[in-house]
């Protein structure tokens, strides 16, 4: 392999939604950093069958503000 072209691959801590912690290797952030998950296999709708709205940073509100009127017809 060519040297100097690959990102640093190091160990990080991952915290799942139920508080479970484990270590894995990743290019994410700095060595020893913590990645806190918002959705994981224990809380994902595809596996649990439960829908929940998760608005991280107001993204859903921003989308609705921008595109909320699409599909509505003005009454004449």
Curated annotation (Swiss-Prot):
Recorded GO molecular functions are: rRNA binding; structural constituent of ribosome
Ranges that cross the membrane: none
In terms of Pfam families, this protein maps to: Ribosomal_L31 (PF01197)
Q: Which GO terms describe its biological process?
A: translation
> PANTHER family annotated for this entry?
50S RIBOSOMAL PROTEIN L31, CHLOROPLASTIC (PTHR33280), LARGE RIBOSOMAL SUBUNIT PROTEIN BL31A (PTHR33280:SF6)
Please give the subunit comment from the record.
Answer: Part of the 50S ribosomal subunit.
Role according to the record: Binds the 23S rRNA.
Quote the protein name from its UniProt record: Large ribosomal subunit protein bL31
Protein's organism: Gluconacetobacter diazotrophicus (strain ATCC 49037 / DSM 5601 / CCUG 37298 / CIP 103539 / LMG 7603 / PAl5)
